Amino acid sequence: MIRKNLLAFIALMVSITSLSAYSSPDKIIPEPVEHSVSDGFYNLKGDGSDVKVYLSDAKFAAKVAGLPAFAQEEAYELIVGKKGVKIYAMTEEGAFRARQSLEMMRLIDRDIQYCTIFDYPRFQHRGIMLDESRSFKGKEFVKKQIDALALLRMNVMHLHLTDAAGWRLQIDAYPNLTDHVAWRVGETYHEWEGLGYPFTNAEDPDAYGGFYTKDDIREIVAYAAERHIDIIPEIEMPGHSMEVNRAYPEIACVGPDGRPRPFSWDLCVGNDGTFEFLETVLEEVIELFPYKYIHIGG
């Protein structure tokens, strides 16, 4: 009896293993709009030679004609069959989204169940925000997050580059922003707050922080563009701007004693120097980020 039960258990385990020994569309996150499977699986090659892409196919164009324009641009149909993989899309961006769905299945297993996937985005803006002011991570971390966004078929990364806790972007016209307020004492915001908001410099052994050079940003933007992801920079204003007042107290508002208040959290809208500062900063930011939007906080 024990032997029979053991054999039955082994048979069950073999059955379960065989069922899960290949990947399928239900493993894709987020779930595609439509997907179906059929018997059989295809062993995906590693060089991409078995993936054929067809752009602006008339039949596919008719299929997506009723979708919003942004959805048409990113829509795709992915077909896995005995002869390989076919991708139909209107644009290179749509084909890229299809490849990411294929990659997500491949990460589970190279054996992909025969399937047909039709997918398009339901939302035009799909992304995350990285708070680089309070928690600076650096270029390689940002690129890793871009890869994760691409795999999830997202299309926006919001970089929160400035806040009271540190300025994170090279601005040639205002070097104090990176020389004096890109580094602080206290790794976490609460540690820094508890110490009285001290800033320091890169040579301090207790320094935490850093900033992105313009070349860093150009590299990040190019890396994101290859993955069809836009980078939205955030330059916080007029609040959450104590770091600016600490770096350039001459544009801070003055107190009743007639002296600047560098610990003020807000930019001084009554000081003409504030507007000169913002205009100059934004000119340099616009040169780095070739997109429609710049975020100013909220």
Which sequence ranges carry the predicted segments?
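Feature activates predominantly on carbohydrate-active enzymes
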Residues: A71-F277, V281-H295
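Acidic, contiguous N-terminal accessory segments
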Residues: I2, L7, L12-M13, S20-R126
